[in-house]
Amino acid sequence: MAEPTALRILVVNGKGGCGKTTIATNLAAAYARLGYSVALTDHDAQASSTHWLEQRAASLPSIHLIAAHQRTGMYTTRAFAQRLPAHIERIIVDTPSAVADRDLDTLLRGIDVILVPLLPSSIDIRAGTRFITQLLAHRAYRAHPVPVGIIANRVRRNTTSHIKLMHFLDCLDVPTVATFHDSALYVRMAEDGAGIFDDAADTNSQREALEWAKLLRWIDDAMAHGSRGQHVGPRPAQPHRSSAESAKA
């Protein structure tokens, strides 16, 4: 039997400030809380994911950091510096604030799922249109197409900007897989290196966690209906359930 490989999820957009790090860190925290062995890869020179993980309490489920933004020393190869522990099951990749076409050659390598956060503003919608077109036409993506999902991020429901964003997303041939609110909750959790799933006692966290469960379910379904091969589940010590089922427990 072939050895299971880690599921690699890329969080990417060509524009900065759309919440890539918030999505990446919360997704890593969610999988860790559900019992997966998780690695968080930080490609951003600002090192926001790295800083988030440095604030994470030892009492919370651990997450392995790969500081891909750091320059390696004279006697250390990049591959060695970014090596993964053998037991890792989920790899979440946080990308730089601006991603050029040439960057996608490296970032798309070995990726299984792509998530594109998008903000509800005219500027972000136009930039998002260009990036998604660029992504789907990129040689690396065409050579190895994988599921792509859009995340409507920092949304205030029933506002004009929200309505415009949803109309735009309805016109795309790419699914909108989650809608996250513009909430101070994310800022507060980030200061402690935590995610939405780490604060089960908070009512606001519980409501937002429902949308995260929707995202996890989409990822599960995308992998189940894809041709990726063996899909790694939670650690054997835990009952076998999908991520979305675990999230609703």
Task: Give residue spans per PLM region.
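C-terminal lobe/tail of nucleotide-utilizing enzymes
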Residues: 1-6, 148-249
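Conserved catalytic-core segment of NTP-binding enzymes
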Residues: 9, 34, 39, 96-182
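Residue-level recognition of oxygen-bearing side chains
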Residues: 23, 130, 185
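Alpha-helix termini
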Residues: 57-60, 136-143, 223-229
